[in-house]
Structures are given as structure tokens and as C-alpha cells.
């Protein structure tokens, strides 16, 4: 049953490693090897590992294991091993203790381990912390112990009589360690300590953490200044954005940690004072007011607004937020009494010494709030200040510190608890009732299905964490539209929806007026107005955020004058944008793709400050080489300018419809008066009256048809809008099963240079909120002869032109622009005045005289019929390869 352990004299090792006898054997190993040597080092390492394993087993299966462990005081052997300073054994010992305390589940077992003072002795032991491996296991061990702290266990660590708390004392020595992993662990340990409800321990902790909390806020100041210095000099390129993201992540993590500490009542008061007097006032507020001392360290206004916004989005402590916002909204610059300066390569907080009279600043009321309003000045070089000013207003709405009364006192629109179920719901219902009831009757149009049926089945679930009123503003339409699609009788849905919302309006009390600073409304309106100018520097994300903030204000302000003036402004700006983009609807062959892509992008909510806040700190990029999406940068070139104006138009149009309560039945664009249901994969269709073309389809990529290289016998059939591949139904003569369906408008057809019987066909999928435009079918269509190939190409080409024409007609109807036949157009607003003419000598050119109608100038919504040359950007399909001569055919 036993076998002798060769190096341990009379010790015999049991076969069962999970037994009390095995622990007794291990205790004997430790007893026989109290002095560490090179010969027994490996034995001790294995013994420590085995002890942790058997103690975890005993915790769950046999209480006598812990009884024996405590009776023989085996932790004392651990201390003796540690005191000998052998690094490998110390590493193994710390790892053993960490595993042991991590896996103990029963409180009784935990109490047994903590019942003597050996754990505190291990915590206080002077390990070689310069060794990275020891430091990693040591800080992990301390962190594991901190998670075991509670009112019942705290007195195993804290001795109230002698005022000894080794865990806290040793951790505080590491708060400024050079490795970020250690600093983060220290923060977590201290947070776990101060969360324990024990009065005597809290008094001790507050006394010993004063310096730490002060250093914590100073590190926040240092991170802010360091990041601001980087932002001042860095270009907006991918590498710099990655570096900036790391700096922002560190700063936001620190703000989150401070916010969690502020939620702990024991340290909230002292920490709140430190945050206000060392960070918020001397750094942030000083940076958004006129400079009063040349030695002051100030942030750029953009950085200050960003940090201010992040602080409001994260921190929920009422006293801190209340103090900060009251200073921001009401105080003068005279309240700033300290500032940060640099002294001997260090940051120091000192009182402000005024070298000259400051009367022009001292008596200026609301200097900080006035700065916020000035951030929306459209004459600035870029929209960075405007974006972060909007972010600040948005964060005020989102903050959970219950400061609504303070904001109301400053004529800042805010939802009060008493009005949440009255005015907010009333304005929401009034804004949306007309659009909801009218859109609820929309059925799914043939061009809206795109080619979802051709892709792999995917289910996307959006589960919002919290449904807020601003979310409801955007979601009412979606919910009602989805119910209309699923209901076979849309009329019933419309009546039910209208009656539901109408009854909600009838039951609401009369509206109450909520005050709004007129200057704030004018400042926000200036962004809308700037969008209508040709030389504006507004990015789409800024306009999107502005529309969101305006909607939030309209939820609380029931002022008819405000609604009327904003509606009028949106109408004027929409007409200006329409006059700019409307002339390209008929003149640009790719306008259809531009509009559909930007509408899909428009439906995506980009206002997510977890991923966009830091990117806007750098100077605005104006080139695709920056790797930024278009909505986050300035446009470059003709196409991007038109795309940006399309997005502007969509946002202004949506805001205007929300203000007037009109339903938008034209968007998303769809072909009107469709006389047939869209075909989907798996449908069985009647082909008695259809013209079929037999072909072999060879996919070039994985798709719904099959794998690349498969040869599939299919029949090609088209309708007005769709390309359909079918397989005959063996059960019904004249019927077929749909195997693929795509939109003709997104189909590209090319001949093959080596085989006249082959067509190369690419069908792209419609863009959506989830996916960009992408090919869903790339395949070769092989026909029996080149005549059938030519017939198929002609049919697909004509079908593509017809489908695109119908879709463009729908876009024109949605925009209110007359549809013009491309064959009648003679000029384009951006046409190159020179073109190569066939038949000319090489290198010679003839100037094309561009003519345009001037009769329609100055009339909004009216556009010239002579927009562009029919040869410019026509939807041409490459010619077929040259066919073999008749003699060669006879030879073959």
C-alpha cells in the first residue's frame, strides 16, 4: 500500500493523493526539510502544490483535512520557508496560497485559515518585489485576499487594539509602482477595503489613505495634461489615433475608479473635495475661461470639454456633480483661486497671484457657460469645439446625479421627475403620432428586400440595456413598422396604432412650459444653419449629435415659437441642400449607390461615446487615407462632398418631419406601384409565361448556390427588378424552385475575353445597418452557344437599366426632383469640358460646348433638363469579345 520515498528516510507515500493520510505525509515532508537546499528544493515545490490541491479537496469533501492542517500549524512551515529567501520556493508558495484562497468556498474553512496571524505575517514579509514573477504572484495574492473581506472577516486582517492593518499598509506602498498591472490591482484592493462596513476600520483607512487619494487626483491631472500635449501636436492618422486611444482608455479607467470610490460613503466626502479643488476647478474650469496667469497650465478648450463630458457621463456622486455644475452655470472667473504650474519637471498646485487688475473678468457673469455657447460659432476653422460642446450638453442630460433642479434654475431644459410621465410623453406622442400612424401602413417594398434571401441565414438580436425616452423617440417608428410588416392586414394595424397613440394624447394633461435659455437654442440652431452653406466645416457626426440634443430639448420645451422657428430653419436648410444634390440625381450614374449607401449609414446610430469620443480630439481629417469613416471626417473630392450633403439632407429631413409630425412614406426609397410580390429563395414560381435561358452557373466564391467551382445547371429568368436563378420542380410541370435572387440594379455583367459563351456576373447585396454593400454572387454563367449568351447579356443589361431607372424615379419622388431621361441630357455640372472623339488623330481633342438652361435659375426645387452628356458615366456594359469569323466557325 505504501512505497518508500528515497530522499526522505522513513517517509512512505500513500497512493491516494486525496486523503488525510496524504496530507500527513506532506506534513512529514515539510518537517524533514525545514532547511532549503539544492537537493530538496524540487521536493518542497511539489509538496506545496500537493498541499493546495488536497486542501481544496478537503474544503469540499472532508473537514478533518483542515482540522489537521490547523492542528499542526502548517502555515508556520510556509513562513519558515519564506524567511530563507529562496526565490523559486517563494514563487511557488505565493502561487499555492493564491490558489488556495481563490478556491475556498466554505466560510468555516476560510476562518480556519485566517484564525491565527500567519496570513498577516505572510502579507508583511519582505519579498523581493523587484522580481517580476514574485511581484505578480504577491499582488495577485493580496487581491484575492481583498475579495474575501466582509464585516465578518475584516477583524482577521485589522487589529483595532494595536491599529495594525498589514493588507492596507502594504498595498499603499505599491500605489505608485511603475507597472500598470500593479497600480490597477492596488486600486481594486483599496476599493474592496473601503467598501467593508466597519466603523473602526474605516477611521483607520481614511487616516492612512489621505495621501493616496491626493496622489490619485494628481495622477488624473497628469494624465489629462499629457494627453492634451499629445493632441496639440499629433496629426489625425491611424498610428496617432491608436496611441491616443490608449491614453484615453487610461484616463477613463481612472475616472471610473474615482466614480466608484465616490459611491463609497466612507471616502466620498474627502475625495469629492479633492476632485473639486485639485481637478475640476483649477484645471477644467480654468481652461475654458480667459487666462489670468502666464504660468498657468491650461488644457485646450477641446480637451477640457471632452474631460468635462466624460466626467459627467461616468460620475454619479450628487455633491460632486452639483458643485461642479453650479460653478459652471453660475459662477464668475473670480471663484478660481488656484492653478496648476510646472516646477522642476513636476506639476504643482498653487494659489493664483494676479499681477494686474482683473476687473474685466471678475465681474463677468456665467463666463464658463458663455464659453460653451461660443463653441457653436460657425465661423471657426472646424467643428471640434461644437462637437464637444454638444457632447457636454448630452452628458448633462445623461448624468444620473439628480441635478435637475440646478439645471432648471439655469434655464437649462431638463426632464423633472414630475414631468416624466406628462410633458415628456405628451411631446413624444405629439412628435410621433402622425408619422407613426402613416408609416404603420407601409408594406415591404420589392427593392427593400435587397438580397437578404441570398445570404446565409443570420439573426441579429438587439437587446437594449435600458429603454430611455430618447431611445423611444427613435424606436417608436421601428416597432410600429415591424408590426405592420408582420400583419397581413395593414389597415387594422394603422387604426389600432392610431387609436392607441391618440388615446395616449387624449389622456395626457395640458402641456406645461419648461424654460430654455434662448441663447442655447440659438447656438444649437447655428449648427443646423451652417450645414446649408457651401463652405461649412461640419462633419456628419456633429450634425447627428446636434439633432439628438435638439430632440432631447424638445422633449421638455413646449414652446410653439421654438418649434415654429426651428421647423422654418430646417425647411430652408433642406431646400438649400436639395438645390445642391438635386442636380446630380439624373446626372451621376453612381448617385443611386451613393444615396443607398448613405441612407443605410444614416440609419446607424453613431453617437456612441465609448468608441467615437477620442477620435474627434485630433484635427479633422480630410482624406480617406486617414482610415476614418466619412461621417467622422471632412469630405475629400466630388463624390464625398455629394455623399456628405446626402447625409446632411437626411438628418435635416428627419428632424423636420419630427417637428411637424408628418410621416415619411418615401424613405427608404422603393419602387412604387409594384404589381407583384418580391421573389425569395425557396419560392415555387410559375414559369408558363416566362422566357427562360438555360445556363451552367459556376460560383467564384462561397454563396447560397454552393461552393466555388461547383457546376450547377440553372435557368435564368428576370422580372422588372430581379435576377432569378431557378431549378425545375420535379413535382409540377412549368413550375420551378428559386435558388437565387438578386436585384438587377446591383448587377454587373461582363463578357469573357477568351470564351464567347461565358458571362461574368456580379450581384451586390443592398447595404444595411449591419453590413456594407458587398458581393453576394460572383459567378460565371456558361451558355450553350454565344447567341444565347448575347441574348442573356442583352436581357440583363436592359433589365439593369430599367431597374435603375425605376429606383432613381423613386429617389426623385422622395426628394421632389423631376426625373429626366438620360438621353435628353446634354451637360453635367461637373463634366470635363474636353473629351476624346472617335476617329480623331491620336492625341487630338475637340472641345464640347456645354450648354445649360438658365430659365430655371433661382427657383427652389426646379432643375435644368440639360444636365450632362449622355456619353458621360452612362450605365454601359462592356462589349462582347470579338466573335470568331465564319470561316473559323466552319473549321471548328
From Swiss-Prot:
| Keywords, alphabetical | Autophagy
**Which residue stretches does the UniProt record annotate as biased composition, category Low complexity?**
844-856
Q: Which InterPro entries match?
A: ARM-type_fold (IPR016024), CLEC16A/TT9 (IPR039272), CLEC16A/TT9_C (IPR045820), CLEC16A/TT9_N (IPR019155)
Residue segments, region Disordered: 844-892
Q: Kindly state one GO CC term assigned in the UniProt record.
A: Golgi apparatus
Which example biological process does GO assign this protein?
Answer: regulation of autophagosome maturation
In this chain, composition skew of type Polar residues spans 882-892
Q: Name all FPL domain ranges.
A: 48-194
Q: Report the function annotation for this chain.
A: Regulator of mitophagy.
Family the entry assigns? Belongs to the CLEC16A/gop-1 family.
* Name used for this protein in its record: Protein CLEC16A homolog
